[in-house]
């Protein structure tokens, strides 16, 4: 692929698709064939066409390839890959645990884990030690999701936990779609680590059954069990609730930690490069949260909803998610389907075809987001609600330099009924962590120093150190992660 001569060799496939579209001016929809590594796919690179795929009135189910990819980690019953009636029942079972009202009750626990994170940052500052932010942020977000979902404090920031270690090993062994998945040792290790996770969660479930729910707070598991017990006979969950719970609790540990940790890491990187944006964030925190940073944890504990009153911080998060979205949605054409691109002839996609909603490509299209590779949180300020032609409502913005994103162009958590179930939790969690760290610490992105120490990584990437003008370009590591985990120095502010 010619794009590989223009970009780092380890650039994430979704970012490669964006470069491919730019190089060859491929338009709103194009075909990509990497057989035998992956099925032939149709990449959607236009908001209107993406809406056609994600809308409720003409559902495009999740493609079976998702199950093939995630099965070693999430089993066969994950809400991420389920379709039709089974998906609806799973969604209704777990969605209440991700409601804003319930998540507000969990904010004090998020504060508690973030305080441990701050202690570790202080240690790195004292030692003036170079470290990679993403792995450390991932342990923070895994600890938070462990409490929210299971009621278990993994304490992985300060010790090794059996489930977390198995989980991290398993992530490294997931298929990558870029090499043939035929190594028997890899398959054995996947089963080994998956069994470790399954047995761990079963012990938690059985302990709850024997001793009752946690008296201090209700977890997502508690809410799901309560709802399951109210279901009538004939439920679709013929696999048995325990296995269903195991598969989906693993799913939430996987999906619930990743977006938050990568987004936090990318925000620290971007704010290090854009002090003018950081100054605006700090000004907002001073105004809304007060200037006594020593009291911030207790303030958020006492008033959890105050974390929702940070519009500029939220704009920074949204712009970061635009630049670095999670991998796009993989759907399957339920029948022969005709798409009508704006600037190309109609395309008929055969039944069963793989359709990839190219979120990265849409987010980096200058037609929808002028200067798409630049960081401008103002794109997402001054929100208002409009009613679309089909009756849906959507929050839109005044935009940056007068350019507001069109409807359906911004989709970091996807859109429609299959929108990420944990999107609200991710936004709350990220705001909590930023509120507790940005005024206490100064973060310095340190890619140049990291490359000096690790020239082998530069060589492996073909000697290229940037994509889209950015050192923290996305690479494939089970999901879309920032290059080298965002190497950083951190300093304690006086």
UniProtKB/Swiss-Prot annotation:
Description of the deletion phenotype: Abolishes the production of acurin A.
Single annotated GO MF: monooxygenase activity
UniProt keyword terms in alphabetical order: Heme, Iron, Metal-binding, Monooxygenase, Oxidoreductase
Enzyme kind, highest EC tier: oxidoreductase
Role this protein plays: Cytochrome P450 monooxygenase; part of the cluster that mediates the biosynthesis of acurin A, a highly reduced polyketide coupled to a serine via a peptide bond. The activities of the highly reducing polyketide synthase acrA and the nonribosomal peptide synthetase acrB are collectively responsible for the synthesis of the acurin A core structure with a heptaketide backbone produced by acrA covalently fused to a L-serine by acrB. After the formation of the PK-NRP hybrid product, it is detached from acrB by reductive release to set up the formation of the lactam ring by aldol condensation.
Documented EC number(s): 1.-.-.-
Membrane-traversing stretches: none
Needed cofactors: heme
Parts forming coiled coils: none
Family under the similarity heading: Belongs to the cytochrome P450 family.
Induction of synthesis: Expression is positively regulated by the acurin A cluster-specific transcription regulator acrR.
Pathway: Secondary metabolite biosynthesis
Protein name: Cytochrome P450 monooxygenase acrF
Pfam families to which the protein is assigned, alphabetical: p450
UniProt cross-references to InterPro entries, sorted A to Z: Cyt_P450, Cyt_P450_E_grp-IV, Cyt_P450_sf, Cytochrome_P450_monoxygenase
Residue numbers binding heme: 420
């Amino acid at each position: 692929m010619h794009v590989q001569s223009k970009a780092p060799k380890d650039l994430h496939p979704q970012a490669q698709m964006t470069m491919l579209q730019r190089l060859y001016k491929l338009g709103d929809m194009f075909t990509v064939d990497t057989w035998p590594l992956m099925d032939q796919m149709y990449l959607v690179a236009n908001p209107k066409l993406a809406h056609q795929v994600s809308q409720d009135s003409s559902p495009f189910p999740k493609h079976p390839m998702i199950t093939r990819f995630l099965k070693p980690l999430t089993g066969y019953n994950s809400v991420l890959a389920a379709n039709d009636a089974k998906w609806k029942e799973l969604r209704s079972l777990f969605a209440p645990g991700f409601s804003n009202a319930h998540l507000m009750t969990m904010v004090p626990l998020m504060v508690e884990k973030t305080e441990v994170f701050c202690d570790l940052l202080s240690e790195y500052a004292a030692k003036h030690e170079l470290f990679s932010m993403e792995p450390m942020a991932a342990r923070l977000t895994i600890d938070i999701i462990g409490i929210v979902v299971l009621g278990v404090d993994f304490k992985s920031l300060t010790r090794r936990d059996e489930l977390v270690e198995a989980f991290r090993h398993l992530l490294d062994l997931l298929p990558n779609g870029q090499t043939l998945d035929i190594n028997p040792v890899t398959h054995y290790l996947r089963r080994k680590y998956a069994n470790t996770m399954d047995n761990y969660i079963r012990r938690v479930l059985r302990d709850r059954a024997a001793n009752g729910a946690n008296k201090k707070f209700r977890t997502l598991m508690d809410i799901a069990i309560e709802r399951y017990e109210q279901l009538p006979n004939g439920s679709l969950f013929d696999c048995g609730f325990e296995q269903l719970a195991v598969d989906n609790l693993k799913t939430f540990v996987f999906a619930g930690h990743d977006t938050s940790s990568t987004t936090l890491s990318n925000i620290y990187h971007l704010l290090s490069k854009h002090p003018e944006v950081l100054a605006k964030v700090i000004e907002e925190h001073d105004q809304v949260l007060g200037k006594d940073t020593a009291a911030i944890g207790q303030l958020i504990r006492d008033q959890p909803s105050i974390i929702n009153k940070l519009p500029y911080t939220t704009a920074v998060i949204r712009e970061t998610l635009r630049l670095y979205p999670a991998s796009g949605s993989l759907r399957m054409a339920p029948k022969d389907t005709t798409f009508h691109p704006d600037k190309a002839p109609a395309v008929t996609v055969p039944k069963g075809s793989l359709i990839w909603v190219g979120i990265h490509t849409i987010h980096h299209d200058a037609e929808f987001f002028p200067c798409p590779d630049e960081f401008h949180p103002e794109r997402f300020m001054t929100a208002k609600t409009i009613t679309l032609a089909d009756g849906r409502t959507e929050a839109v913005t005044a935009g940056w330099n007068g350019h507001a994103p069109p409807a359906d162009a911004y989709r970091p958590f996807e859109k429609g009924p299959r929108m990420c179930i944990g999107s609200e939790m991710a936004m709350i969690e990220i705001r909590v962590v930023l509120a507790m760290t940005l005024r206490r610490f100064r973060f310095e992105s340190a890619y140049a120093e990291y490359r000096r120490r690790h020239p082998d990584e530069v060589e492996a990437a073909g000697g290229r150190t940037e994509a889209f003008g950015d050192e923290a370009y996305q690479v494939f590591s089970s999901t879309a992660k920032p290059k080298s985990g965002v190497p950083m120095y951190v300093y304690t502010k006086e």
